């Protein structure tokens, strides 16, 4: 248990934003803002001088921008960085680049003209700083994925949608902090003729999931898209739940589909892995493989037990390969999983589990 405050450096080119973030963080006695910086170059000097536990970082700054500063930070050591990102398409694009470079996590600033203010995301920023400050360990080492190489590689042609069959397995994934890189690694290993369908709840703001889906699609042989109500569960397809929606499945005579809803958050989350896991357990039972992966909190830790109880396979990512061992740890402690597996082994597990008799929409 930490007994001293988490020492935070705030880096942002806006004097107003630096002041607002500082005032917001200092309301929590577990956090101490030890300094601020207006650009990346000054921020690096402050890191050397003050040795913060966590850095909050704006990406769009003059002189040295946040991306360049992040490159230097990841080369120099293990100081966790929380990106405070613009809630725009360009902001989402840059945020995912930052996560690949080694940022610990991100928070989306409300858009100008929005009714939301920075105070609306205060709890999220504070929670992520606390998790990052507690982690303070080397990020798990996983095999890196060269996106450019993946895009240029000759992949097997993806079967057209009309010719694809019902899937052999329904794979449901709940994931949070550390998820973008883990999903890129895992999904990019799957072949175009992968026999399962994949449903993903990644804790991410509305608007960011579309950009995230597009980035994954560029690097994967399987189809990856942001889910829409009525999307069919097809072999070789991964559907990512949109931010601020819940995702369930429904069995239909003409093909099984996903259904999105605007129901209230569950355990503080929308989308919620608990909602997805309960739905797939009810509809598909033993034909489900559920993964609870890296992330803070306990979303999905209870409902993955419903998959296990229904005869499906419930899998938790192990501590060594998790950026934050929160969600999987709680699921393990509650006895709700069958296996604990490292990230490097998950692609093979999915391929082996999916190499089975295909699901019929009528059984």
Swiss-Prot record:
Modification comment: Phosphorylated by CheA. Phosphorylation of the N-terminal regulatory domain activates the methylesterase activity.
Residue ranges annotated for the Response regulatory domain, each copy included: 7-124
Compartment(s): Cytoplasm
A Pfam family assignment: CheB_methylest
Residue ranges constituting the CheB-type methylesterase domain according to the UniProt record: 160-357
Matching InterPro entries: CheB-like, CheB_C, CheY-like_superfamily, Sig_transdc_resp-reg_Me-estase, Sig_transdc_resp-reg_receiver
GO molecular function, one term: protein-glutamate methylesterase activity
Cellular component aspect of the GO annotation: cytoplasm
SMART domains: REC
Keywords: Chemotaxis, Cytoplasm, Hydrolase, Phosphoprotein
Enzyme Commission number, as recorded: 3.1.1.61, 3.5.1.44
Primary site of residence: cytoplasm
Description of its domains: Contains a C-terminal catalytic domain, and an N-terminal region which modulates catalytic activity.
Protein name: Protein-glutamate methylesterase/protein-glutamine glutaminase 2
Protein species of origin: Koribacter versatilis (strain Ellin345)
Primary gene name: cheB2
């Amino acid at each position: 248990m930490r007994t001293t405050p988490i020492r935070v450096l705030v880096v942002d080119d806006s004097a107003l934003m630096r002041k607002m973030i500082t005032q917001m963080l200092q309301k929590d006695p577990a956090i101490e803002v030890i300094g601020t910086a207006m650009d990346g170059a000054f921020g690096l000097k402050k890191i050397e001088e003050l040795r913060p536990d966590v850095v909050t970082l704006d990406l769009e700054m003059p002189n040295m921008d946040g991306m360049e500063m992040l490159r230097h930070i990841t080369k120099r050591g293990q100081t966790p960085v929380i990106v405070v990102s613009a809630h725009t398409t360009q902001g989402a694009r840059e945020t995912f680049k930052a996560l690949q470079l080694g940022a610990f996590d991100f928070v989306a600033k409300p858009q100008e003209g929005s009714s939301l203010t920075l105070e609306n995301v205060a709890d999220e920023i504070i929670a992520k700083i606390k998790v990052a400050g507690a982690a303070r360990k080397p990020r798990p080492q996983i095999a890196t994925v060269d996106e450019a190489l993946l895009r240029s590689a000759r992949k097997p042609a993806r079967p057209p949608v009309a010719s694809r069959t019902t899937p052999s397995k329904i794979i449901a994934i709940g994931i949070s902090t550390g998820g973008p890189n883990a999903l890129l690694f895992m999904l990019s290993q799957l072949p175009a003729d992968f026999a399962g369908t994949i449903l993903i709840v990644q804790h991410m703001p509305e608007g960011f999931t579309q950009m995230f889906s597009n980035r994954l699609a560029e690097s994967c042989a399987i189809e990856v898209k942001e889910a829409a109500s009525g999307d069919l569960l097809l072999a070789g397809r991964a559907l990512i739940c949109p931010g601020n929606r819940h995702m369930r499945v429904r069995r239909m005579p003409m093909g099984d589909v996903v259904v999105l809803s605007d129901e209230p958050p569950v355990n503080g989350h929308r989308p919620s892995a608990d909602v997805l896991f309960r739905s797939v357990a009810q509809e598909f039972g033993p034909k489900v493989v559920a993964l609870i992966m890296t992330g803070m909190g306990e979303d999905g830790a209870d409902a993955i037990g419903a998959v296990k109880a229904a005869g499906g396979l419930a899998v938790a990512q192990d501590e060594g390969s998790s950026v934050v061992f929160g969600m999987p740890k709680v699921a393990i402690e509650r006895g709700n999983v069958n296996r604990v597996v490292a990230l490097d082994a998950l692609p093979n597990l999915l391929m082996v589990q999916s190499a089975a008799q295909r699901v019929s929409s009528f059984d």
